[in-house]
């Protein structure tokens, strides 16, 4: 099939300073104190991927009802100093590009949020993306070229109560195409930089990070039968946990991440009641002119979705990184690989 692609991307930024009118003496005093006037900034981008399909009967391309196919995104964000950010995204995919699932067809404002920041706290209400650690139990993200957008609509709180400590708590419903699943997600994450508490590590210029996270989902009861008279007793609440440790010193970087979840029968695992787990190990060293990387991963039954009966690429709560051999530009098709959520080693 002959295809003509047209990709257009535009980015704009508008900033304005707003400062109350002050007497000359007060204005000079404010400047001498080093205080900056509040700044209102408007940023945005427009991306439109357009395809003009052409029929070619000689090779049997078939035909399209639409003469123009497009995936168009418009992002806008309004920031007031460092305290408030309000934004949203308009998407037009009424006639999506080939390769996207049919449920992507539609248009509207699919993403909007408001984020407030004050001292050591940050609160987001609306849609947001989040990742705990390496994403083994929770990673929501957008990859529009692959048709992935599993954002959460709800609330998220981030705190920095102590030096080197970061806490996260969130809850909401996950996006599925142009709707949101009925199941409810919640979770928490804690990361502690131990080098900021242990003087010996700080003196040796070493970094030691400890992370813990919890992700849970509640999904309503559903009638699923494995035979005409055998109804499954499905768990309504599913929990997943993660613990990770990372050490850095000079050119060395060592990381270990282990995650597990309780029994979670779903279409992905053929409604098995087995528990799931994944272990991720990574070690690297680099210096001028030399580097090496060694990684290993073992996973079993770690497909984790907010809709147990879902298929395709939507509604995934977690993310399992893909490990494969490095490719060259000339041989990109060698060693093709896709993550196997049911298990791999």
Features from the language model and the residues they span:
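Outer-membrane beta-barrel architecture
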Residues: 75-77, 112-115, 156-158, 187-193, ...
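Residues that define the transmembrane beta-barrel architecture of outer-membrane proteins
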Residues: 38, 66-72, 105-110, 148-153, ...
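Exposed, low-structure sequence patches enriched in small/polar residues
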Residues: 47, 60-62, 69, 107, ...
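Short loop/turn motifs that connect adjacent beta-strands in outer-membrane beta-barrel proteins
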Residues: 20-42, 78-86, 115-120, 124, ...
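Transmembrane beta-strands of outer-membrane beta-barrel proteins
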Residues: 41-49, 77, 85-91, 124-128, ...
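Outer-membrane beta-barrel translocator domains and adjoining extracellular loop/strand segments
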Residues: 54-62, 97-105, 135-142, 178-185, ...
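Outer membrane beta-barrel
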Residues: 77-173, 287-310
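Cleavable N-terminal export/targeting peptides
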Residues: 1-33
């Amino acid at each position: 099939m002959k295809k003509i692609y047209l990709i257009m991307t535009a980015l704009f930024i508008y900033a304005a300073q707003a400062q109350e009118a002050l007497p000359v003496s007060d204005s000079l005093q404010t400047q001498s104190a080093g205080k900056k006037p509040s700044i209102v900034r408007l940023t945005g981008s427009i991306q439109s991927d357009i395809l003009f399909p052409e029929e070619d009967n000689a090779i049997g391309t078939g035909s399209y009802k639409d003469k123009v196919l497009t995936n168009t995104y418009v992002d806008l964000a309004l920031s007031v100093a460092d305290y408030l950010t309000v934004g949203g995204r308009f998407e037009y995919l009424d006639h999506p590009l080939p390769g996207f699932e049919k449920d992507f067809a539609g248009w509207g404002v699919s993403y909007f949020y408001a984020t407030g920041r004050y001292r050591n706290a940050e609160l987001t209400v609306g849609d947001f993306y989040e990742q705990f650690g390496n994403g083994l139990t929770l990673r929501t993200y957008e990859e529009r070229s692959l048709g992935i957008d599993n954002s959460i609509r709800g609330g998220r709180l981030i705190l920095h109560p102590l030096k080197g400590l970061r806490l996260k708590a969130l809850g909401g419903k996950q996006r599925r195409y142009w709707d949101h699943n009925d199941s409810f997600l919640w979770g928490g994450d804690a990361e502690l930089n131990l080098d900021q508490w242990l003087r010996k590590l700080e003196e040796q210029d070493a970094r030691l990070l400890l992370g813990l996270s919890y992700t849970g989902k509640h999904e309503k009861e559903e009638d699923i039968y494995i035979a005409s008279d055998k109804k499954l007793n499905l768990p309504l609440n599913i929990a997943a946990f993660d613990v990770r440790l990372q050490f850095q010193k000079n050119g060395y970087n060592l990381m270990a991440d282990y995650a597990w979840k309780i029994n979670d029968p779903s279409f992905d695992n053929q409604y098995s009641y087995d528990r799931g787990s994944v272990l991720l190990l990574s070690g690297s060293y680099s210096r001028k002119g030399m580097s090496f990387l060694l990684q290993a991963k073992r996973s079993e039954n770690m497909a984790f979705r907010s809709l147990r009966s879902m298929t395709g690429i939507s509604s995934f709560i977690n993310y399992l990184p893909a490990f494969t051999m490095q490719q060259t530009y000339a041989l990109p098709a060698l060693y093709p690989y896709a993550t196997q959520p049911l298990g791999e080693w």
